Design a protein with these regions (language model features):
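Membrane-anchoring hydrophobic helices of lipid-metabolizing enzymes
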Residues: 1-71
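Catalytic core of membrane glycerolipid acyltransferases/transacylases, capturing the structured
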Residues: 24-41, 51-53, 68-125
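Short gly/ser/thr-rich secondary-structure transition/capping motifs
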Residues: 52-60, 129-130, 184-187
Length: 245
């Protein structure tokens, strides 16, 4: 039954995201608020669809922790759900993503138009960090939040690795705060998994971390400690002895 429900969800979500992406491309001439509104509507629809069809009930904790000013979001990446959940919940944000995404037909093009992402080559090391800082500062100055997946890729549920420093370095140079986010979406919708198992998914937004007054490496450790500690609390797949690789 879970497989049937999951395939139904994938089919409907796939059709509707294609429609939304085409609409976005058709209104490329409109003010930026129009394609963004289409994106938010689809993301909320997808969250609703997951709840109705697959029993993926989402619970948000810590909304009061969101700063009033644009900030850097550092969020755990274990599933697909968190990518559109955050669009439905957070203020307008762009993402730091691998450059291959821009070449995905229709959806990738629409994403490029709506989010104006910070595309990086993950293998370019320091050059990628410089890209994130330079482009991220421009987005923040324009009032747009910046989302960073600090592990650099989607991790198998229950695993972690050392966090990249680009998010903390950007926040320091932009003089803004970091909002850490942990969630257990991977427990129910794992990486590369077709089956979505019903359950309560907790998205936990932590207290903002002021990155402007300390070394990015120190800030990174504070953020990583909070996220990984919260993951051990909310995810049944986490090993208490798990250490970053």
């Amino acid at each position: 039954m879970a497989m049937i429900r999951s395939l139904l969800f994938i089919s409907i979500a796939g059709m509707t995201v294609a429609i939304a992406a085409l609409l976005i491309l058709l209104v490329f001439w409109a003010p930026a608020s129009v394609p963004w509104a289409i994106t938010v509507v689809w993301c909320r629809h997808a969250v609703w669809l997951g709840r109705v069809i697959c029993g993926l009930d989402t619970q948000v904790e810590g909304l009061e922790n969101l700063p009033d000013e644009p900030s850097v979001i550092m969020i755990k990446h274990t599933s697909t759900l968190e990518t559109y959940w955050q669009v439905a919940v957070f203020p307008k944000a762009t993402w730091v993503v691998k450059r291959e995404v821009m070449w995905v037909p229709i959806v990738g093009w629409a994403m490029n138009l709506v989010l104006d992402p910070i595309f990086i080559n993950r293998g370019s090391g320091r050059s990628a960090v410089k890209q994130v800082i330079a482009q991220g500062k421009k987005r923040l100055a324009d009032g747009i939040w910046v989302t960073v997946f600090p592990e650099g890729t989607r991790m198998p549920p229950g695993e972690t690795r050392r966090y990249g420093v680009s998010g903390a370095a950007l926040a320091q140079q932009a003089g803004c705060k970091i909002v850490p986010v942990a969630h257990n979406a991977g427990d129910f919708w794992g990486r590369r998994s077709i089956v979505k198992r019903p359950g309560k998914i907790r998205f936990c937004i932590g207290p903002p971390v002021d990155a402007s007054t300390q070394d990015p490496k120190a800030t990174n450790l504070i953020v990583q400690d909070w996220i990984e500690s919260k993951m051990r609390e909310i995810s049944v797949l986490y090993d208490d002895e798990q250490e970053p690789r």
